[in-house]
Design a protein with these regions (language model features):
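Active-site pocket-lining/capping segments in soluble small-molecule metabolic enzymes
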Residues: 2-122, 140-144, 149-232, 239-243
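Anion-binding and metal-coordination hotspots
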Residues: 136
Length: 243
């Protein structure tokens, strides 16, 4: 029997967790107070995280926690605590951006499942294969991958997670420095100011939003994703309201 593709919903608050579960999500992803690529979301302290996991598990919904920002050396102790908080809350997996964070998580909690974040910029068969060989259970692939590239990557015995709805960045995930350059707010630290959404003059065009891409929506192709072996259909939007 063909496996049903997982519907993975975002949650920036407990209200969003409840909304996702009631709407039929198979899993939710959310961030702790630190090391989340959506630092402006409410996010979850230890008690809130435990409450969210308890509520989700009662309804047979999985919870994945994001630790997917660039991490500096002087933050290692807080990072260790973040990993242990997630483990104590009994989350189902960590979504990580940094290989050092992945190694640390393996050392602290060997049984923890690891998902490679889209911030790793995995956009090829070889990238997916490398992460599988490193022991990752799932890879969140770049939004830029084509159907042909996804089909090839799906041959590797690792779960693939694909964004099916949400905003598109002008740059490959994990590679954009636009916000950091213009306003000292790094998207790779969870603080993107989204300057690409502003109007710019380009050549003879003196106004317009040349760098602001239309939203991504491949929901009509979910059946095709399932047929090629994609494990999870991911909805972007931890900054969005519950409704």
């Amino acid at each position: 029997m063909e496996n049903k593709i997982e519907i993975l919903a975002p949650a920036g608050s407990m209200d969003s967790v409840i909304a996702a579960v009631r709407s039929g999500a198979d899993a939710v992803y959310l961030g702790e107070k630190e090391f989340s690529a959506r630092s402006s979301a409410h996010n979850f302290d230890e008690n809130e995280l435990k409450e969210a996991v308890r509520y989700c598990h009662i309804h047979s919904v999985k919870v994945y926690v994001t630790l997917n920002t660039i991490v500096f050396d002087d933050e290692m102790q807080r990072l260790k605590e973040a990993v242990l908080i997630a483990a104590r809350a009994d989350v189902d997996a960590l979504i990580v951006q940094n290989m050092g964070v992945a190694r640390l998580a393996r050392q602290l909690v060997p049984s923890m499942h690891l998902h490679a974040s889209t911030q790793m910029s995995v956009h090829s068969y070889l990238g997916v294969k490398a992460l599988y060989e490193m022991g990752f259970e799932r890879v969140v692939v770049s939004r830029e991958m084509s159907k042909k590239e996804l089909e090839k990557a799906a041959e590797i015995p690792v779960e693939l997670e694909v964004f099916v709805h949400g905003a598109l960045c002008m740059c490959v995930s994990g590679q954009c420095y636009f916000s950091a350059m213009l306003g000292s707010r790094s998207g790779n630290r969870g603080a993107c100011a989204q300057p690409c959404r502003l109007p710019f003059s380009v050549g003879k065009v003196k106004d317009g939003h040349a760098l602001s891409l239309k939203d991504n929506s491949i929901i009509p192709y979910i059946t095709q994703l399932q047929e090629m072996g994609v494990a999870s259909a991911k909805i972007e939007g931890r900054m969005k309201r519950p409704e």
